[in-house]
Amino acid sequence: QRQMCIRDRDMGDLRVIPAEIGGGFGGKTTVYLEPLALKLSEKSGRPVKMIMSREEFFRATGPAPGTVNTVKIGCKKDGTITAMSAKLIYESGAYPASPLGPGCMCVFAPYDVENIHIEGFEVVVNKPRVAAYRAPGAPQSVYAAESVLDELAEILDIDPLDFRIKNAATKGTQSAYG
């Protein structure tokens, strides 16, 4: 859309037939060669077909971010969670653009806990830029939190599913980020 606006063209002038099916999950958010295809179509006055092989697609993207996550959870003996804390460190590659925000939003989202503290840090490193895949940023942070919940359930001798249900967010629960 942005490319069409820049060129003062109507969206109706553009026809896109995506070959991939399913949701975006982050992988379809990146603009690859579309601006080039649009310019070639303008210059030639003909439709331009853009096809990327799987190899080209993977070369055009980047890796998911490396992360270092620290999660602390406090609870009563009956399994009521009293506090949750997370320190999330996400690599962004050579340029700032990691999915740290969604990681912070999702880390404790399923739970109704009054005391939550989340710190997030994005670190620029000498690696390729990261790309979005499969719920960008969420799997890394959620895996850390859910692993700690499993450990706590074992220590408390509570069924892990019952432990989660006991502390689950319900309609009207305010998220940690507001």
Model-derived features: where do they sit?
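Structural alpha/beta core scaffold segments of enzyme domains
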Residues: 3, 7-178
